[in-house]
């Protein structure tokens, strides 16, 4: 839309998987309702290809496809036909054989991304790359697995997803069930989600009680709390914990 409005062609880089682990972990820690990404790699691959197809069709976008996946590259080349008005991108030290073929033998535009900086700046980046490409499901890792055949490595991701009915990965539970069956995870709010943010803003704008409370109004409440402390302290840890759990549930329920 921006390209059409400004009558300019905008370079757009398509990537996948770089922050998958951290996004999963963040969503679990925050106790959000669901994950903002796919839990199966095949679904991510299908989504990447769908985006790539739309980018190839867009006249106001210069597509840059960042991938080390040979099947993804082959699919994009098939869709592109004779067009070469796009480029492929790889990380320094990875996908060299695949990109050597693209550049030397076929003459496609490619770009190599290399990290630059001190040890402190680069360590987090390198760890993310190790996690991404060291995963069992990554294309680079599968290439080194002698137990996998070419057919296994180049299996159609669409068929993979169809075979499981599009269901989520069974080993990645919803954030709410992270600690099941012992307890339910606390519920968080995704402030990056506009409907959620608007709901919070609306709740803040209309508090349940607009009447301010002064010190004298709190005195009877403190007195009641002190009277009940002796009885409360004699209750078992389990009973008190159950009360706190119930209070937390009520706070979540009536948060708005």
Where are these regions (language model features)?
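Positively charged, amphipathic and often flexible ligand-engagement surfaces
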Residues: 1-185
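Short, structured beta/alpha segment
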Residues: 141-256
């Amino acid at each position: 839309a921006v390209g059409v409005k400004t009558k300019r062609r905008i370079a757009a880089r398509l990537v996948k998987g770089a922050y998958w682990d951290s996004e999963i972990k963040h969503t679990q820690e925050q106790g959000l309702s669901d994950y903002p990404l796919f839990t199966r790699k095949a679904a991510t691959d299908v989504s990447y290809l769908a985006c790539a197809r739309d980018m190839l069709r867009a006249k106001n976008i210069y597509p840059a496809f960042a991938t080390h996946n040979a099947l993804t590259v082959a699919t994009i080349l098939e869709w592109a036909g004779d067009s070469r008005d796009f480029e492929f991108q790889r990380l320094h030290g990875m996908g060299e054989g695949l990109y050597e073929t693209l550049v030397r033998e076929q003459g496609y535009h490619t770009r190599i991304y290399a990290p630059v900086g001190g040890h402190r700046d680069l360590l987090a980046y390198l760890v993310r790359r190790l996690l991404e490409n060291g995963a069992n499901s990554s294309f680079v890792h599968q290439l080194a697995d002698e137990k996998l055949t070419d057919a296994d490595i180049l299996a159609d991701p669409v068929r993979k997803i169809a075979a499981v009915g599009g269901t989520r990965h069974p080993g990645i539970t919803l954030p709410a069930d992270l600690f099941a069956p012992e307890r339910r995870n606390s519920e968080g709010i995704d402030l990056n989600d506009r409907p959620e943010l608007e709901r919070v803003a609306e709740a803040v704008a209309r508090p349940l009680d607009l009447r301010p409370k002064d010190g004298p109004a709190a005195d009877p409440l403190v007195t009641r709390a002190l009277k009940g402390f002796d009885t409360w302290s004699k209750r078992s840890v389990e009973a008190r914990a159950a009360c706190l759990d119930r209070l937390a549930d009520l706070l979540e329920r009536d948060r708005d």
